[in-house]
Amino acid sequence: MQNLEINHQIPASFIEALQKRILAEPQKTGIMICGHGSRDLGAVAEFSKLAKAIASHLPNVPVDYGYLEFATPIIKTGLKNLQDQGVKRVLAIPGMLFAAGHAKNDIPSVLNTYAAQSGLQIDYGRDLSIDTKMIRAASDRVKQAIMSAGDGISNDETLLMVIGRGASDPDANSNVQKVMRLLWEGLGLGWGEVGYSGVTFPLVQPALEHAVKLGYKRIITFPYFLFTGILVNRIYAYHDKVAAQHPGVEFIKAGYLNDHPLVIETFLNRLLEILDGENSMNCGLCKYREQVLGFEDQIGLPQESHHHHVEGINDAPNHTHDHTHSHAHSHSHDDDHHDHAHHPYPHADHPHGPNTLDKEIP
């Protein structure tokens, strides 16, 4: 049985050019990496490790990080640390896969508030989004799972189940579908399906139960997540539950993205985009700007954060950028959150949505 080695090297010429660009800025410039935060200590440790990996590639540039909620340091602490080092301009990037509520509203709200109070210039980058480097990193995780399982079942007889976070933002949810299609077609697998860990539909269990009915001999469950945490653990628990009910199908778990070198390179590219003025998020399907089907009542909601009261809480049972929204985000959370006053998700009662959660799975 073979193991796939990940030996991608970020081009030294790219790293050198990026650092020179940052150091050549007229104002002392630093980098802020903005994470969501989690009650899971493993997730917090993995984000910290990734942030430090980014910093290691830019040794002469001040780099800090912080979390929106449930973990420390909070974002404001990281920004103050940069200011204390004499930084006058901050390149801030969201440590998130897609632009849903946190990347569009909560983080910009925190950054804008700090900038207004401190006078610090903060330029905000975009999410990791759909990117060829991210797809290659994801494909490595899937190929690792296939190679660890052995060659007893062909790719033609394999179904790939990509599990996304799930959001009340239909644009972010649709991106998971695109990731799945690019992996399915690129790897030449027999079939591809999508599920979500929460908020929207289908959730993991109904998605896997549907996949079994399609008759493939192998099902690979791939959490399209950056880090471990409560949700990834829950995804694997549902995977195990459905697998136990169908012993005639081979169920394989793929690892999440974590600190794959191509993920780190994508983050570094987001910094370059800010310097080049190319850091606009995709507004074409933004539910706060356009009449997105089913979400028409959310257009134009005010931009604000609902997470101030959970900043730094890690034991709870708890700018300026080209994509300037004038709206608040709206999402429903099934975990990792205190209750926030959010706009309700319009399909929360869908038969394959949150009401299918197994209360016995934490």
Regions found by a protein language model. Give the residues of each.
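Active-site-proximal alpha-helix that buttresses catalytic centers in soluble enzyme cores
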Residues: 1-362
